[in-house]
Regions:
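Acidic/glycine-rich phosphate/pyrophosphate-binding loops and surrounding catalytic core
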Residues: 2-210, 223-231, 237-239, 250-259, ...
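Short beta->alpha hinge that forms the Motif I/post-I loop of the SAM-binding pocket
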Residues: 220
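Cys/His-rich Zn2+-binding cysteine-cluster or related metal-binding knuckle/ribbon modules and their
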Residues: 246
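Active-site loop ensemble at the mouth of alpha/beta enzyme cores that anchors a bound cofactor
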Residues: 275-280
Length: 281
């Protein structure tokens, strides 16, 4: 099965990861301890309930070192599985599989952790109509993968980068002199999507009048957020953001906002407890 993500070169990612891990000397432990013709079978499993993300990427690490490896995928990305579930079965050259083990586990643990935390947030707002968004708070070089993981968890992607929409924040406003002036400048530059961060109710009308197409309601408590949504009255999408946790997100969603963005689903997700056990054939 071919795995493809726009703007992501999986082969280059795998090669760079191995270059970092192997250096010039290679896997000296496996070379010394494991005879060249030894074959292994292995099972990747989870020790906790998780949402899957990144299994095709883990497979790519094994196939890069053993193109003839046999891999049986037992679940698919986006699936929710219980503790003890087997994820992959593989059989191939022992040295290659041992060398690829840690990079493969690193990425699948990281991405499953993101997908699992994301699903907790999505479940918390079920039935409210609000949509969970991720943010640009990602590890440099891993954004495409991390945003893929949030999608597997049920979120939608916010901006992929600075290029795909204007987002006017407090520092832009400070330089421009006002919210309205910052929005006018973005509109004059021909930018179609203009997201404006506001943290006070009196900023809403000036932002809308100047041409904002989306309002980010930053760090507002529930009562102020509800009032802000009423003031906007559906003229543009609204987005709650700022310090939102699994425990507080539902109250924010019930104010009627269109979106809720949460940085911690990528920034603070713990790695999933996933392991890989091998045995000689």
């Amino acid at each position: 099965m071919t795995f493809h993500l726009d703007a992501f070169d999986l082969d280059a990612f795998v090669a760079a990861t191995f270059a970092e891990d192997l250096g010039e000397g290679g896997d000296i432990t496996s070379a010394a301890v494991i005879p060249a013709d030894t074959r292994f079978t292995g099972v990747m499993d989870t020790r906790e309930p998780i949402v899957l993300a990144g299994l095709p990427i883990a497979e790519a690490f094994f196939r890069a070192l053993d193109p003839e490896v046999s891999i049986e995928r037992l679940v698919e990305d986006g699936d929710r599985v219980e503790a003890g579930a087997d994820l992959l079965r593989l059989s191939g050259k022992a040295r290659a599989l041992l060398t690829a083990e840690r990079p493969a586990l690193n990425i699948v643990q990281h991405l499953c952790g993101i997908a699992t935390l994301t699903r907790r947030y999505v479940d918390a707002i079920a039935g409210t109509g609000a949509i969970l968004l991720d943010t640009r708070k990602t590890i440099p070089g891993l954004r495409v993968l991390e945003k893929y993981a949030t999608r597997m968890g049920g979120a939608e992607n916010h901006r992929m980068g600075l290029w795909d929409a204007a987002m006017i924040k407090d520092n832009h406003v400070a330089v421009a002199g006002s919210v309205a002036e910052a929005v006018r400048r973005a509109a004059a530059a021909g930018i179609a999507r203009i997201i404006v961060e506001v943290d006070r109710l009196d900023q809403i009308e000036p932002a809308l009048a100047a041409g904002a197409t989306h309002l980010l309601l930053d760090n507002m408590d529930v009562s102020v957020l509800r009032e802000a949504v009423a003031l906007v009255a559906g003229r543009v999408p609204t987005e709650a953001s700022g310090g939102i946790t699994v425990e507080t997100i539902r109250a924010k969603a019930e104010t009627g906002v269109t979106y809720i963005s949460v940085g911690r689903i990528t920034q603070s997700a713990p790695a999933a407890d996933i392991g890989l056990d091998f045995a000689s054939e």
